[in-house]
Amino acid sequence: MKKFARFIGIDDGYFVRNVHKKTKLIGAITKHTILDGVLSREITIDGDDVSEKIIDMIKNSNHYYQIRGIILYGITFAGFNIADVELIYKNLGLPIIIVMERPPKDIFYKAIEKYKPNGIELIKKAGPIYKTKTPFGYTYYQVYGIDKDTASNIINNLAIVSKIPEPARVAHMIARGVTKGDSSKPRAGGDSNPGPAG
């Protein structure tokens, strides 16, 4: 895959459970390190609409035919709104990489089993969790529609200032900035999940 190919990173905005019903879903399109476009939708807290919103957001964008892959910042969004990578790939035909700062803990899976009956099945669709070493530490990742070695190369090519690839890092900053007023605020708080980034 070309070094300057366009990728879209996707992350969700800040929310407080039992206060907010929806939050922003942000897609940041980068051409290597250059921000080339921003897409947005709203998703339901603990809902089931993130996959259809990702599909709609990308498919109806002028950038669709230029994008070479999707990088999700975690597989869960807006609480327990879990991305269905099989459905996304089937509709868009784009390889998917899910990146995490750390592997999920047992409490994450227990929470999924408790609050989202089909959640574990959706997570399993993304396959095993791998790790790749970047100049900033290990990045953990899952893949769909692409092999793990190619995904590792993409992550390292786009890990410019942190172990999170630039499209996902920028999407995270924009999402937090527009929903919380400050992109530098940490994930911990009302919008955090008991597991990997998402």
Swiss-Prot record:
Annotated stretches, region: Disordered: 179-198
Domain of life: Archaea
A Pfam family matched in the record: DUF99
Family: Belongs to the UPF0215 family.
HAMAP family (UniProt xref): UPF0215
UniProt name for this protein: UPF0215 protein NEQ431
Origin species: Nanoarchaeum equitans (strain Kin4-M)
